């Protein structure tokens, strides 16, 4: 495809337009008085959101070069979301200000590379100061952080605080939709471990990049699976039952993984696979724990068990399994509660007779996973749109609270960034020329989150920042008063602020040092066979159904795998998918 090229100031100005386009839509979502953004969806009702990452992902700009700028700032939001779970709007606001100030200075003759060095020096200084101001999160502060992160929603803050108190910070907390109007907290059996899906093709929710299986059957084995020959009988039983299916194995690779993906995509099986957690003997022990939790039989080589002998009775079950790219969460049924309790007691006895402190720690980790259970936050709402909105708010608040437990908290409302901005003066004075300018770009950007929080609450941002500096107090946008924000419980997770700063400086510096921008030139839409305005589907043949191969391996008669369906010309039956069923 032909490329459109843009050079030097022209390219940077076009990129800036894209950055501003996204940032101006995103920054209304920051603070306790934030505004909502309504997003049209191709199917279903529109979404109403107050989440920077969600807004940024939906934006496309007609100008291809400006759209590159939009995608760069969307990357800031998504990266911060992925790493910290919150802080996307803060990161976006910081990036926009750095880009704007940087481009002004470049237009005046500043060297982009020196600006970049200055910005990076400023970032290092800011992160050091941020760490020194961070304090550990006490138990009573958990609800405060959760409430602030939920935009001041005390109900959400209370529910998350209760969930954290019951399952502890290491426990599993999941958010799901409820059939009622009320948002409730439910504690059930379950656990999570650090392994994700074997292939992204198993994802069931493309927007969240998550695979969710409701009431699945579960095969657990310590064997490596590279071919599905031995699993054909059990797969046929699963297909007949219509149940979702999870394979948890030492590894699943090659032909076996390819075949599962093909059958998943063709709708033959609702299946996913996950590699077993840990390594060596600890892996086997972890699989035994999961087998107890789900009521499965561990198919182990040590017991001379083979996959071809697996029956439906050997499989485990769960209420729900949620799999991300790096984590699996199992919500179990209550009927395994006694088995889990017995397993925990057995592990406690092992701790008492184990002399190695390292082994004791590892066994205690297993006990915590098994005994902790899963806290289910069931989100209730009157409409589908409200449900999505509340669910996003709870997920953001939960992520921010976990981040606060990890690295502590600082005064919220942007107050900490303003204090550090003043400290940057000392570093700026010891630097020269464009290096100093780069530091000052970061210094000015640190004021922007507070200005936008104030603006969203109906106040003048510049006046608010000046008053914060004069009074040496923070600004409570809820009450419109200046006060000690730590005493008021307005706290920001240090991790969220740190990652927002790192991601914003990274993208802003890259954009400022860009000299050439290249984008595809959009091709004009081709006219249909009948000319402009004609039915675009005209002239197409009928669409045939995919042909279905049999189940099994080549050479097994009518159960060949992967079998090709009939391949015909358009309108003659269509092209079959390779599959095994």
Curated annotation (Swiss-Prot):
UniProt xrefs under Pfam families: Cpn60_TCP1
Record CDD domains: GroEL
Compartments in which it is found: Cytoplasm
SUPFAM superfamilies: GroEL apical domain-like, GroEL equatorial domain-like, GroEL-intermediate domain like
Stated name of the protein: Chaperonin GroEL 1
Family statement drawn from the similarity comment of this UniProt entry: Belongs to the chaperonin (HSP60) family.
Top EC class, one word: isomerase
Functional note: Together with its co-chaperonin GroES, plays an essential role in assisting protein folding. The GroEL-GroES system forms a nano-cage that allows encapsulation of the non-native substrate proteins and provides a physical environment optimized to promote and accelerate protein folding.
Keywords: ATP-binding, Chaperone, Cytoplasm, Isomerase, Nucleotide-binding
Binding sites annotated in the UniProt record for ATP: 29-32, 86-90, 413, 492
Primary gene name: groEL1
Keyword Nucleotide-binding set for record: yes
Catalytic activity of the protein: ATP + H2O + a folded polypeptide = ADP + phosphate + an unfolded polypeptide
Region (Disordered): 522-541
Gene Ontology molecular-function annotations: ATP binding; ATP-dependent protein folding chaperone; isomerase activity; unfolded protein binding
ATP-binding keyword on record: yes
Any Gene Ontology biological process: protein refolding
Quaternary data: Forms a cylinder of 14 subunits composed of two heptameric rings stacked back-to-back. Interacts with the co-chaperonin GroES.
Alphabetical list of Gene3D superfamilies matching this protein: GroEL (3.50.7.10), GroEL-like equatorial domain (1.10.560.10), TCP-1-like chaperonin intermediate domain (3.30.260.10)
EC numbers for this chain: 5.6.1.7
Classification lineage: Bacteria, Bacillati, Cyanobacteriota, Cyanophyceae, Synechococcales
Comp. bias intervals (Gly residues): 528-541
Gene Ontology annotations for the cellular component aspect, listed alphabetically: cytoplasm
């Amino acid at each position: 495809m032909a490329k459109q090229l843009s050079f030097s100031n022209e390219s940077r100005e076009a990129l800036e337009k894209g950055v501003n386009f996204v940032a101006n839509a995103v920054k209304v979502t920051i603070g306790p008085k934030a505004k909502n953004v309504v997003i049209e969806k191709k199917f279903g009702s529109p979404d109403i959101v107050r989440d920077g990452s969600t807004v940024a992902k939906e934006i496309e700009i007609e100008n291809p070069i400006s759209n590159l700028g939009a995608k760069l700032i969307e990357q800031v939001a998504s990266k911060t979301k992925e790493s910290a779970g919150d802080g996307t709007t803060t990161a976006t606001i910081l990036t926009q200000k750095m880009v704007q100030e940087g481009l002004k200075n470049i237009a005046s003759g500043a060297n982009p590379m020196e600006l970049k060095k200055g910005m990076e020096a400023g970032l290092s200084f800011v992160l050091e100061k941020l760490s020194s101001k961070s304090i550990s999160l006490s138990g009573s502060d958990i609800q405060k952080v959760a409430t602030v992160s939920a935009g001041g929603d005390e109900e959400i803050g209370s529910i998350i605080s209760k969930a954290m108190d019951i399952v502890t910070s290491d426990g599993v907390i999941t958010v799901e939709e409820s059939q009622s109007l009320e948002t409730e907290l439910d504690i059930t059996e379950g656990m999570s471990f650090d392994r994700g899906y074997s292939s992204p093709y198993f994802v069931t929710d493309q927007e969240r990049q998550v695979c969710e299986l409701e009431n699945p059957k579960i095969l657990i084995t310590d064997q490596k699976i590279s071919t599905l020959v031995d699993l054909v009988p059990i797969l046929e039983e699963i297909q007949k039952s219509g149940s979702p299916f999870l394979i948890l194995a030492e590894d699943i690779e090659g032909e076996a993984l390819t075949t599962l993906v093909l059958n998943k995509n063709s709708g033959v099986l609702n299946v996913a696979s996950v590699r077993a957690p840990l390594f060596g003997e600890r892996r086997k022990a972890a699989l035994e724990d999961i087998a107890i939790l789900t009521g499965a039989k561990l198919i182990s080589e040590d017991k001379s068990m083979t996959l071809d002998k697996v029956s439906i009775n050997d499989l485990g079950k769960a209420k729900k399994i949620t799999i991300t790219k790096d984590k699996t969460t199992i919500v179990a049924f209550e009927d395994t509660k006694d088995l889990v309790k017995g397993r925990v007691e057995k592990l406690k006895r092992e701790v008492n007779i184990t002399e190695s402190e390292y082994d004791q720690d590892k066994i205690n980790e297993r006990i915590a996973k098994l005994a902790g259970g899963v806290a289910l936050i069931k989100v209730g709402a009157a409409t589908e749109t409200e449900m999505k909105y509340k669910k996003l708010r709870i997920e953001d608040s939960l992520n921010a609270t976990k981040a606060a437990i990890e690295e502590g908290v600082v005064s919220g409302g942007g107050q900490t960034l303003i204090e550090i901005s003043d400290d940057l003066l000392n570093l700026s004075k010891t630097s020269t020329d464009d290096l100093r300018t780069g530091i000052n770009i970061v210094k000015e950007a640190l004021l922007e989150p507070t200005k936008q929080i104030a603006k969203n609450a109906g106040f003048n941002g510049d006046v608010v920042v000046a008053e914060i500096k004069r009074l040496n107090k923070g600004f409570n946008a809820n009450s419109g008063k200046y006060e000690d924000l730590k005493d008021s419980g307005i706290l920001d997770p240090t991790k969220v602020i740190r990652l927002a700063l790192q991601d914003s400086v990274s993208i802003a510096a890259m954009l400022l040092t860009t000299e050439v921008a290249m984008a595809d030139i959009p091709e004009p839409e081709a006219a249909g066979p009948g000319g402009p305005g004609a039915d675009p589907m005209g002239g197409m043949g009928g669409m045939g159904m995919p042909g279905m191969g049999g189940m099994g391996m080549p050479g097994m008669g009518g159960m060949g795998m992967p079998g090709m369906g009939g391949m015909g010309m358009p309108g003659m039956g269509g092209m079959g998918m390779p599959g095994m069923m």
